[in-house]
Structures are given as C-alpha cells and as structure tokens.
Amino acid sequence: MTFSRWLSDLVRSSLGVGVRRLRSVSATIGVIGADSRLAQSFGSFGRGSALLFPQGVIYNEKYIRIGSGTLVGPDVCLTVGMGPSQEMLTNPVVSIGDRCVIGRGSHVIGHWSILIGDDIQTGPYVYITDQNHGYEDLDVPVGLQPTKEASVRIGSGSWLGANCVILPGTDLGRCCVVAAGAVVRGSFPDHTVVAGVPARAIREFKDGEWRRPKG
C-alpha cells in the first residue's frame, strides 16, 4: 500500500468515526423530554416521555397531549390543522396515552379528534389521520375538493404494524392487532386482528377462544 493510499484510508476512517460520534451526540442532546422548553408548548407532555431526534414536522402542538412514559421515534410528524397557528374547534385534537411507542417515520395528522389510548405500539411509517378529501365533483381535482373529518379512536393495548394506514372514522377496540400495510376504516371490537386493503377482521376472540369471523 502506498503512503498516499494509507493516508487517504486513515482520513476516511477518522472522518467516519467523527460523523458517527456527532450523530450519537446529536441523538442524545436533540431529544425533547418533559423538562425541555419545547415540551412546554404541548397541551400536556407527561413525565418520562420523549420525542427522539431528529423530530419530524411538528406544529400546533398546543392541541396535542402526550401521556407519561411515551416514546415517539425519530422522524415522526405530529401536526394539527392545515398549518401552524391555525385555531382549532376542538382541544385536544390529538391525544396519545401513557406508555405508548410511536415508530420511526410515522405520521399523526389531526384536524378534529384522534384518541390513541394507553400501551399502544406502532411499527415504523404508520399513518393516522382524521381527515380526507371528498370526491363528489368529478370535474374538480381531488386535492381541491372539500375535506371531511371523522374522529379516530385506537383502543388501549393495540398494536399497529408497519406501514398501515388508519383512516377517518376508524374505531379500534382494546388490544387489537393491525397487520402491516393494512388500510383501516370502520369499527372493530376488542381483541380483533385486522388485515388487508381495505382491512377486514380475520381473527376475533369470542367465548374464550380465537375464531375466524363469519362472512
């Protein structure tokens, strides 16, 4: 190995170590915890909760409540309304309970009411919203049509798999499981496993045993 090659490899290795250390330090000091100034801008922010670094887009956080012991992963977006400083008709708009884990890159987009219970875990890149565009006028681009809101509730103890989508009007009972990639709308009782596009119940716990739903 020539001296120039050795020096180039040494510099590259040293830079790599420096970048990794900087990333580690940034991840540590960039956390938003209950005692941080930014946490005070939320409607409430429970003890032991944290928003990991780097955070995604966050605005109108005064309408967002986060319980205790909840971990929000990196790049998670938490937004209320169409833009910062919009005054909302309901408060809170987004409520995340105690001891939840929101996976990396997930989006919680609230306009009316999103209630996420306690002890809920999501995989990465889950999308939860209570608003969608209408499609009544075929001559108007869908993105320009009036929006419609419908409350979302996710029952305590539920698990949402990676890349699933929770649409307006969804009402999940306690301890439900949503399969990865499912697109969910509608009501599902406690202890139901839902999967598919559109999602449907594939297992439910009734009379002391797991059953495949009829129909």
Positions of PLM-derived features:
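Histidine/lysine/aspartate-rich catalytic loop segments that bind and position anionic ligands
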Residues: 117-139, 144, 149
